[in-house]
């Protein structure tokens, strides 16, 4: 017997070395454990409280335990109860035979002694014969416990687990619970101390060198010496064998339907075999006890088992495999473009799906077995130990599986991590996730190449510069979070392409786009005389990103985004006549948002544009813009976007073409750059990654100011704009809305656009076109020209001084109706739209009614001209109105038109007038079909929701 125990002891010590290697490392103690327990190796300690008094009448089991522990190398320690209690309480492992403390694994002598003092065991100990065997039995019991622990905790670094309170610590606790449950159930089932020690030792021997649950079941099969009627370890063995069988779901080539089927097959097989064994045993016990064993009892067992199997558990797993399949399909294209990240995601989904399927199948089986055994044992006193055993063991196994699942998930994630790191090692200087954005961009470029090649024709530009911002990609974000590499990922990347004569050019030699420094340089125009700079997607603000991954909880991490911002984009143009649409350049940054996502605090990125030579057009965006038009005829448009009404006051400007434009953007939605959080899950681990992107966010309104220099024309917004001109020659277009335009001094060109506008030419020879709507027009001093078209509405003109003209540019003079209404001359076109020239007859009537009245004003327009250059003078109007008793007869008007001498004279004047009208051809509003600057009409694939185009002028 001594040799046998020596061999067992040697084997047990060997099996414990794996766990002990981790236990022997020192480290920082848990704060909760107290300074008194700060040092000491991690080991097994037989703990005996100083004040513990064992019952000598029931044997000397405690003394035998102490002797056996000393021989087996187990430290025996008597401690103050308060110190151990602190450590046990801090880790939540009290009231069991085994406990986990900061100092190591505690084997509680009082708890073990209680087991040895159970009635049926204690009676055996009380005999003289059994007392002489006490030492051997105690040694056998302790060595068996050592062996079990050596397997349950194999490979665990308890020192690190205790310090970090990691997932492994929880798993270690669950392992101890399993060991406690086995010991308790064996103690409750055997009849003698010999049997208790023998069975503990057998179980420990069987578990030597077992690594994990996958082979635990096989080791338990055929375990001899266990009374089926008392312990039922064949049932436990079957349960663990079922856990092993479930791993067949790991076949990577199996289809989703096959995996789901395998899960059901496993559950049914385990349920069938185990429940059959349990049920037959329980029913036999019921018969022996004189209890019912009829059909209804068997039906109760079957129904309880069937309720425990839920197809919904497997449906969720099937979705995971379907996701992996769709990712693999999606990944094919990008793999050809040099990026395999989507395949890595699919690999992760399949790997974790397999784990989920395995654990779900096992837990389903365990739940079914526990339910079946409980139903079968109902009312059977004899069967209760079996029901308790199965219920306890299945619960502990489920706990171990759930906590093991996290480690398995991390194993799959680590493989993904290593592949990304290896790729970057083999591609020095490259970023794996940036490579993903490159592939996304190339695919987008391929999809839209036909459209892009047609842009030269559509935008009427010899060269088109297309700038594309690839924004945050959820798949790339998932991959970064899963692989714990969120610090390497970017919020996106900007790209530039050039197109000439329907050909795609390499833009890196033609255009400088530096998102880090905020530079856009398109000055290298070569031979191209016209170019259009198109921002296909919203361009994020300039600057560089840095990320920092920090732990916020046991399984929670966040990768914080830090942005080194540049306060402006600097745009440089060259000699070509260029068009810039800046409405897709993000200038507003949402610094703070409320719970509803509304922007409450903002920051702005300025745009500074130097246009150089050429006749340029700039469509201003949502923020402060500084424009130096340089040479050429340059126009600044506010007609795209919805960025508030203009207030322009150039009355104090000392340089022609200089303007300060104030805007107030009323509350509503506008393009903002905001920071959001992407969440990726790896089992219990939650990875949050901050990133920035553009979005139309609701805001409370804001002011912005633009500075314009060397600008020849300004086109207003759809709001109610105010224009106050300079002492120089100004060109204003009100756009939509009810606009107020004052040309001030200079020879101004003023266009109202849509809406009921008020336009005053001021001093100088002004060109005034009210546009659509019922406008109030005033020429002021100077030789002014007014224009009215069919569909423009009812206009009212007040004129004073100068040689003025009114052109009905699309009406024949003879089709108009002239009549006197009160003091005014009213001219009506064929659409019954009226142009009223205020106070035309007032001075003449005053002269008739007031003696010696001297006229002080000239409120008449000296010439009224039709579309073919035919005209009637103010003198002719007065004569024919008087002749027609307040209205010019059509016959008289026809005579005027047919007067060849007048027509000949009018041709020369008409040519001059046509030049004036054509010079205003750039005046346009967002809904005016006349002279609209070209913008793309085609659209990208609707699925690419982030892609936007230049809005219609």
UniProtKB/Swiss-Prot annotation:
Membrane topology: Multi-pass membrane protein
PTM text: Acylated by LktC. The toxin only becomes active when modified.
InterPro entries from the UniProt entry: Hemolysin-typ_Ca-bd_CS, Hemolysn_Ca-bd, RTX_C, RTX_pore_form, RTX_toxin/Mannuronan_C5-epim, RTX_toxin_determinant-A, Serralysin-like_metalloprot_C
Biological processes annotated in GO: killing of cells of another organism
Annotated Pfam families: HemolysinCabind (PF00353), RTX (PF02382), RTX_C (PF08339)
Domain of life: Bacteria
Transmembrane segments: 230-250, 297-317, 359-379, 381-401
GO cellular component, one term: membrane
UniProtKB keywords: Calcium, Cytolysis, Hemolysis, Host cell membrane, Host membrane, Lipoprotein, Membrane, Repeat, Secreted, Toxin, Transmembrane, Transmembrane helix, Virulence
Domain notes for this protein: The transmembrane domains are believed to be involved in pore formation in target cells. The Gly-rich region is probably involved in calcium binding, which is required for target cell-binding and cytolytic activity.
Summary of the function given for this chain in its UniProt record: Pasteurella leukotoxins are exotoxins that attack host leukocytes and especially polymorphonuclear cells, by causing cell rupture. The leukotoxin binds to the host LFA-1 integrin and induces a signaling cascade leading to many biological effects, including tyrosine phosphorylation of the CD18 tail, elevation of the intracellular Ca(2+) and lysis of the host cell. This leukotoxin is a major contributor to the pathogenesis of lung injury in ovine pneumonic pasteurellosis. It also has weak hemolytic activity.
Family of the protein in this entry: Belongs to the RTX prokaryotic toxin (TC 1.C.11) family.
Protein name as annotated: Leukotoxin
């Amino acid at each position: 017997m001594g040799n046998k125990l020596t061999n067992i002891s040697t084997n047990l010590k060997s099996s414990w070395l794996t766990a002990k290697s981790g236990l022997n490392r020192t480290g920082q103690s848990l704060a909760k454990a107290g300074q008194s327990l700060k040092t000491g190796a991690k080991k097994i300690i037989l703990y005996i409280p100083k004040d513990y008094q064992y019952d000598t009448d029931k044997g000397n089991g405690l003394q035998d335990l102490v002797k056996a522990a000393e021989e087996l190398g187990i430290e025996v320690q008597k401690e103050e109860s308060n110190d151990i209690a602190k450590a046990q309480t801090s880790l939540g492992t009290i009231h069991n035979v085994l406990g986990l403390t900061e100092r190591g694994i505690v084997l509680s002598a009082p708890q073990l002694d209680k087991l040895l003092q159970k009635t049926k065991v204690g009676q055996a100990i009380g005999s003289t014969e059994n007392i002489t065997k006490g030492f051997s039995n105690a040694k056998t019991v302790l060595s068996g416990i050592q062996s079990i622990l050596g397997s349950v905790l194999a490979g665990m670094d308890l020192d690190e687990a205790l310090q970090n309170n990691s997932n492994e610590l929880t798993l270690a606790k669950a392992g101890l619970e399993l060991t406690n449950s086995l010991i308790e159930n064996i103690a409750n089932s055997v009849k003698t101390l010999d049997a208790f020690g023998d069975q503990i030792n057998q179980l420990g021997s069987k578990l030597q060198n077992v690594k994990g649950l996958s082979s635990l079941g096989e080791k338990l099969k055929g375990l001899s010496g266990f009374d089926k009627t008392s312990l039922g370890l064949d049932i436990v063995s079957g349960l663990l064998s079922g856990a092993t069988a479930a791993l067949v779901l790991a076949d990577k080539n199996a289809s989703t339907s096959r995996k789901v089927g395998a899960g059901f097959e496993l559950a049914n097989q385990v349920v069938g075999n185990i429940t059959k064994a349990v049920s037959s045993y329980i029913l036999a016990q019921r018969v022996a006890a004189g209890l019912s064993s009829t059909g209804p009892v068997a039906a109760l067992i079957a129904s309880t088992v069937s309720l425990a199997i839920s197809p919904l558990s497997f449906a969720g797993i099937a979705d995971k495999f379907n996701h992996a399949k769709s990712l693999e399909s999606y990944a094919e294209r990008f793999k050809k473009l040099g990026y395999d990240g989507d395949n890595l995601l699919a690999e992760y989904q399949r790997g974790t799906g397999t784990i989920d399927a395995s654990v779900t199948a096992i837990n389903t089986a365990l739940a079914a077995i526990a339910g079946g055994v409980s139903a079968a044992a109902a009312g059977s006193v004899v069967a209760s130990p079996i029901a308790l055993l199965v219920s306890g063991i299945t619960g502990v196994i489920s706990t171990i599986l759930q906590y093991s699942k996290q480690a398995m998930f991390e194993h799959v994630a680590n493989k993904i991590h290593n592949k990304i790191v290896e790729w970057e090692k083999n591609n020095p200087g490259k970023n794996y996730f940036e490579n993903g954005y490159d592939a996304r961009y190339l695919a987008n470029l391929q999809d839209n190449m036909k459209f892009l090649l047609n842009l030269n024709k559509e935008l009427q530009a010899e060269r088109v510069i297309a700038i594309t911002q690839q924004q945050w990609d959820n798949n790339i974000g998932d991959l970064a979070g899963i692989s714990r590499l969120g610090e390497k990922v970017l919020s996106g990347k900007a790209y530039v392409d050039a197109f000439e004569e329907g050909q795609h050019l390499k833009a890196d030699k033609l255009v400088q786009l530096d998102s880090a420094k905020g530079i856009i340089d398109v000055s290298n125009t070569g031979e191209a005389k016209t170019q259009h700079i198109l921002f296909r997607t919203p361009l994020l603000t300039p600057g560089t990103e840095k990320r920092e991954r920090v732990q916020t909880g046991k399984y929670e991490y966040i990768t914080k985004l830090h942005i080194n911002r540049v306060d402006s984009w600097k745009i440089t143009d060259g000699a070509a006549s260029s068009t810039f649409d800046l409405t897709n350049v993000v200038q507003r940054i949402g610094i703070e948002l409320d719970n509803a996502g509304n922007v409450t605090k903002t920051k702005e990125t300025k745009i500074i544009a130097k246009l150089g030579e050429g006749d340029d057009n700039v469509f201003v965006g949502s923020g402060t813009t500084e424009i130096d038009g340089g040479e050429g005829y340059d126009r600044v448009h506010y007609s795209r976007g919805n960025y508030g009404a203009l207030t322009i006051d150039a009355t104090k400007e000392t340089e022609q073409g200089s303007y300060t434009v104030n805007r107030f953007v009323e509350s509503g939605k506008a393009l903002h750059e905001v920071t959001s959080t992407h969440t990726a899950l790896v089992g219990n681990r939650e990875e949050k990654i901050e990133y920035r992107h553009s979005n139309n966010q609701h805001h409370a309104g804001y002011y912005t100011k633009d500075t314009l220099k060397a600008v020849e024309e300004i086109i207003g917004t759809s709001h109610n704009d105010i224009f106050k001109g300079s002492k120089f020659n100004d060109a204003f277009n009100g756009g939509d809305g009810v606009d107020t335009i004052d040309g001030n001094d200079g020879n101004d060109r003023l266009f109202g656009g849509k809406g009921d506008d008020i336009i005053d030419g001021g001093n100088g020879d002004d060109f005034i076109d009210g546009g659509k709507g019922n406008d109030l027009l005033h020429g002021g001093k100077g030789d002014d020209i007014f224009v009215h078209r069919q569909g423009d509405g009812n206009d009212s003109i007040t004129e004073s001084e100068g040689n003025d003209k009114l052109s009905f540019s699309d009406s024949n003079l003879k089709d108009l109706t002239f009549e006197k209404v009160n003091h005014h001359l009213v001219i009506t076109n064929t659409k019954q739209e009226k142009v009223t020239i205020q106070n035309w007859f007032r001075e003449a009537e005053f002269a008739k009614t007031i003696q010696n009245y001297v006229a002080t004003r000239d409120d008449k327009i000296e010439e009224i001209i039709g579309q073919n250059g035919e005209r009637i003078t103010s003198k002719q109007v007065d004569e024919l109105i008087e002749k027609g008793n307040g209205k010019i007869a059509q016959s008289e008007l026809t005579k005027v038109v047919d007067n060849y001498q007048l027509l000949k004279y009018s041709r020369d004047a008409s040519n001059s007038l046509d030049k004036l009208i054509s010079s205003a051809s750039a005046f346009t509003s967002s809904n005016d079909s006349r002279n609209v600057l070209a913008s793309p009409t085609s659209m990208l694939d609707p699925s690419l929701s982030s892609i936007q185009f230049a809005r219609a002028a």
